[in-house]
């Protein structure tokens, strides 16, 4: 019996790449332009099927708005931002950016995508934590 392989949408792939670059940026503290370029070069073969303009927008705009994003997240976290698992922080930052600034993307899509990305990159229970936090943030941003 063959296992059915689900093809990921270009936007899902863009979100996955944005989370990876946000993680690298947070860990390394290198310039965002350097992180993005190195990621694209390193992942050359993996970049097929990625909505590149959306990936670049998500990464760059999340970095540009990180103070706003972090201030939105802070009241809904059970610990300080710096104590979050770095990958969870990257997923939350991306999702909060989308909830706040990408108003053409339905909030349910943003939350679902964050959960799915957490299942790929996060710890075993990360997706539940991500869901709980975003479920509280969305109404606060008038997205529910």
From Swiss-Prot:
One of its GO terms (molecular function) is RNA binding. The keyword Endoplasmic reticulum does not apply. GO terms for cellular component: cytosol. GO terms for biological process: DNA-templated transcription termination; transcription antitermination. InterPro entries: NusB-like_sf, NusB_fam, NusB_RsmB_TIM44. The keyword Cell membrane does not apply. It comes from the Bacteria. Keywords: RNA-binding, Transcription, Transcription antitermination, Transcription regulation. Signal peptide: none annotated. Involved in transcription antitermination. Required for transcription of ribosomal RNA (rRNA) genes. Binds specifically to the boxA antiterminator sequence of the ribosomal RNA (rrn) operons. Belongs to the NusB family. HAMAP family: NusB (MF_00073). This is Transcription antitermination protein NusB. It comes from Histophilus somni (strain 129Pt) (Haemophilus somnus).
């Amino acid at each position: 019996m063959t296992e059915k392989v689900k093809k990921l949408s270009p936007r899902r792939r863009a979100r996955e790449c944005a989370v990876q670059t946000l993680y690298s940026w947070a860990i390394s503290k290198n310039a965002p332009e350097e992180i993005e370029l190195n990621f694209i070069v390193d992942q050359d073969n993996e970049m097929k099927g990625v909505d590149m303009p959306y990936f670049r927008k998500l990464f760059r705009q999340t970095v540009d708005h990180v103070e706003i994003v972090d201030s939105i997240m802070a009241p809904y976290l059970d610990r300080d931002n710096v104590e979050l698992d770095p990958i969870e922080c990257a997923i939350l930052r991306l999702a909060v950016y989308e909830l706040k600034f990408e108003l053409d993307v339905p909030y349910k899509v943003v939350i679902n995508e964050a959960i799915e990305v957490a299942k790929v990159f996060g710890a075993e229970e990360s997706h539940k934590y991500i869901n709980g936090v975003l479920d509280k943030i969305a109404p606060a941003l008038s997205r529910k």
